[in-house]
Amino acid sequence: MPTINQLIRKPRSRLIVKSKSPALENSPQRRGVCTRVYTTTPKKPNSALRKVAKVRLTNGFEVISYIGGEGHNLQEHSVVLIRGGRVKDLPGVRYHIVRGSLDLQGVKDRKQSRSKYGAKRAKKAA
């Protein structure tokens, strides 16, 4: 326990909270242009071909972001919306691309969790 004199000489240091998604700069989402769309493999216990895109954001950052859902229509120069949220088994992927917004279409034939994948409600068969 420091004395009051010691605290006057050197105050307690404030805890610095580091952002988990610095490229967003405290915005909920950011717009960007795809510079490369490709697949990559996850870390050790898992095995797959995960779809990711390298995106140049409007604020100049270049980030790798994940494309969720089955199938996508992204190519180079597609304009996309980025949100925060990392992918645990892909190192360096700290952002997700928002489905159903700007150039990225929603997931086709999606019945559950539609809002997360930008899918419209299916028409009732009468």
UniProtKB/Swiss-Prot annotation:
Keywords: Methylation, Ribonucleoprotein, Ribosomal protein, RNA-binding, rRNA-binding, tRNA-binding. The modification 3-methylthioaspartic acid is found at D89. GO terms for cellular component: small ribosomal subunit. InterPro entries: NA-bd_OB-fold (IPR012340), Ribosomal_uS12 (IPR006032), Ribosomal_uS12_bac (IPR005679). It comes from the Bacteria. PROSITE patterns: RIBOSOMAL_S12. One of its GO terms (molecular function) is structural constituent of ribosome. GO terms for biological process: translation. NCBIfam families: rpsL_bact (TIGR00981). With S4 and S5 plays an important role in translational accuracy. Interacts with and stabilizes bases of the 16S rRNA that are involved in tRNA selection in the A site and with the mRNA backbone. Located at the interface of the 30S and 50S subunits, it traverses the body of the 30S subunit contacting proteins on the other side and probably holding the rRNA structure together. The combined cluster of proteins S8, S12 and S17 appears to hold together the shoulder and platform of the 30S subunit. This is Small ribosomal subunit protein uS12. It comes from Polynucleobacter asymbioticus (strain DSM 18221 / CIP 109841 / QLW-P1DMWA-1). The gene is rpsL.
